[in-house]
């Protein structure tokens, strides 16, 4: 807890905003038994962190990929995100895109769609809930 309040005005709270990538207990399994941390990349085996055998036992884990997903996508470690007033709403955007930006020199925009239009969103929210 870093003092970020997220449950104001119906905004998502921290237990639901960040995706499965950074949750150590969450995996997605494809039909061939490959395990992924993100459902957006399911089927792309270069992102698989492990594979289940026919008995359902996890085979060797790709610790490099797993560690990147669990630890490298922290938006609080990003100077831009850590200073952004929208961080409590978006939590840094998509962790997979953040990891691709860091390790594969991609240039995905991870900012929330609310950035730049939050005042309008709040006005609409208040007008609908008054």
Give the location of each predicted region.
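A C-terminal junction/extension of Radical SAM enzymes
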Residues: 1-44, 89
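C-terminal accessory region of radical SAM enzymes
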Residues: 1-11, 40-85
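Short clusters of hydrophobic/aromatic residues that line enzyme substrate/ligand-binding pockets
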Residues: 19, 49-52, 111
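Functionally constrained cores in energy, signaling, and assembly domains
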Residues: 22, 53, 96-100
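Detector for glycine-centered tight turns/loop "hinges" at secondary-structure junctions
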Residues: 33, 56, 101-103
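Radical SAM enzyme core and accessory elements
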Residues: 46, 76-130
């Amino acid at each position: 807890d870093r003092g970020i309040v997220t449950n104001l005005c119906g905004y998502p709270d921290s237990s639901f905003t960040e995706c499965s990538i950074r949750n150590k207990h969450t995996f997605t399994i494809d039909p061939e038994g490959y395990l992924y941390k993100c459902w957006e990349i399911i089927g792309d085996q270069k992102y698989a962190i492990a594979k289940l055998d026919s008995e359902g036992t996890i085979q060797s884990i790709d610790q490099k990929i797993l560690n990147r997903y669990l630890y490298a996508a922290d938006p609080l470690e990003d100077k831009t995100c850590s200073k952004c007033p929208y961080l409590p709403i978006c939590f840094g955007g998509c962790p997979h895109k953040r990891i691709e930006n860091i390790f594969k020199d991609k240039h995905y925009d991870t900012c929330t769609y609310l950035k730049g239009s939050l005042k309008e969103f709040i006005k609409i929210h208040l007008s609908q809930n008054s």
